[in-house]
């Protein structure tokens, strides 16, 4: 192999690895901060139990912070349900999706562990683990989580899609998360994010109804992706192109506009990112 070709290959691999490692760290960090601050708001302090509005506002702000930190690096998923939705919509490859989810679960666990470590013993006993409340059945809990996550993922797609809006994704997605909490707290404590449920459950070892907070959100995310990408705003990718994107052998049209540009300054050009 020619030396010049070797150098180009080395630079390509090195640059690709740098981009991937930054994206994974961004997902790890964003999810960890989201869990630390969000779950921290539901802790049952004896002198002042948290109100539903307080929890909703805190999760709103935690979401906005996580999105603002990571959206230009990784796309600001910070949620396995969002990553699955992007995979179903052919906006991310399977290898990258698996790596993202692993980073998210690791970040959620570290965030929950940090919160557990700094919280007094009597307050941290349940660590905000999601459970079913108010005589809600498991079927009802799954349905609630499905609907809550469906509206969240639809908002994520619409907020991140540069074809639709130039507003702030952090503010809009944060508002969607707050909306979910204002309703969902009474049913399930409101997850909408399997990583948010996973981290605290790992630290305190409570998995009694943990499956609900995977089945509901992931199903809602898939439905939201199908609705947005195939009904509301369908694209023209062929089956072959979608399969190539799935395995990471082709370029992917960006739903997330990482570097927003004025549309009038572009002439027949499209933003793309390399799928991995």
Curated annotation (Swiss-Prot):
Membrane-spanning parts: 23-43, 52-70, 97-118, 139-159, 166-185, 211-231
Membrane-side (Cytoplasmic) residue stretches: 1-22, 71-75, 86-96, 160-165, 232-276
Any GO CC annotation of this UniProt entry: cytoplasmic vesicle membrane
Intramembrane parts of the chain: 76-85, 190-202
Any one of the GO BP annotations: renal water transport
Keywords (A to Z) from UniProt: Cytoplasmic vesicle, Glycoprotein, Membrane, Repeat, Transmembrane, Transmembrane helix, Transport
Motif window: NPA 1: 79-81
Top-level taxon of origin: Eukaryota
Impact upon substituting residue 72 to H: No effect on chloride ion selectivity with respect to sodium
Short motif NPA 2, span: 193-195
Record keyword Repeat present: yes
PROSITE patterns membership: MIP (PS00221)
Cell compartment(s), UniProt: Cytoplasmic vesicle membrane
Principal place of residence: membrane
InterPro entries assigned: Aquaporin-like, Aquaporin_6, Aquaporin_transptr, MIP, MIP_CS
Tissue spec: Kidney.
Record's catalysed reaction(s): nitrate(in) = nitrate(out); iodide(out) = iodide(in); bromide(in) = bromide(out); chloride(in) = chloride(out)
Summary of the function given for this chain in its UniProt record: Aquaporins form homotetrameric transmembrane channels, with each monomer independently mediating water transport across the plasma membrane along its osmotic gradient. Unlike classical aquaporins, AQP6 is an intracellular channel with selective anion permeability, particularly for nitrate, and exhibits very low water permeability. It may also facilitate the transport of gases, such as CO2 and NH4(+), as demonstrated in vitro.
Subunit text: Homotetramer; each monomer provides an independent solute pore.
Family: Belongs to the MIP/aquaporin (TC 1.A.8) family.
Descriptive protein name: Aquaporin-6
Organism: Rattus norvegicus
Lineage: Eukaryota, Metazoa, Chordata, Craniata, Vertebrata
Gene assigned in the entry: Aqp6
């Amino acid at each position: 192999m020619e030396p010049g070709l070797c150098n180009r290959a080395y630079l390509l691999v090195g640059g690709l690895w740098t981009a991937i490692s930054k994206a994974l760290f961004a997902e790890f960090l964003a999810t960890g901060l989201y869990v630390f601050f969000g779950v921290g708001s539901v802790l049952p302090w004896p002198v002042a139990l948290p109100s539903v509005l307080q929890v909703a506002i805190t999760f709103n702000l935690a979401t906005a912070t996580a999105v603002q930190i990571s959206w230009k690096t990784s796309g600001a998923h910070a949620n396995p349900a969002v990553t699955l939705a992007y995979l179903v919509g052919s906006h991310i490859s399977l290898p990258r999706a698996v790596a993202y989810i692993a980073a998210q679960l690791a970040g959620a666990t570290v965030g929950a562990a940090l919160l557990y470590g700094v919280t007094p013993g009597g307050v941290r006993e349940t660590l905000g683990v999601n459970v079913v409340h108010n005589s809600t059945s498991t079927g009802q809990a799954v349905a609630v989580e499905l609907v809550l996550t469906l509206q969240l993922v639809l908002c994520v797609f619409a907020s991140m899609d540069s074809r639709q809006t130039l507003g702030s994704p952090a503010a809009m997605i944060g508002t969607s998360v707050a909306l979910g909490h204002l309703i969902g707290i009474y049913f399930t404590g409101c997850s909408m994010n399997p990583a948010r449920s996973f981290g605290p459950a790992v630290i305190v070892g409570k998995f009694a109804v943990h499956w609900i907070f995977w089945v509901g959100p992931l199903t809602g995310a898939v439905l939201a992706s199908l609705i947005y990408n195939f009904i509301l705003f369908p694209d023209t990718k062929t089956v072959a192109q979608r399969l190539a994107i799935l395995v990471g052998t082709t370029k992917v049209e960006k739903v997330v506009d990482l570097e927003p540009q004025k549309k009038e300054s572009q002439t027949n050009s499209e933003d793309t990112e390399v799928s991995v």
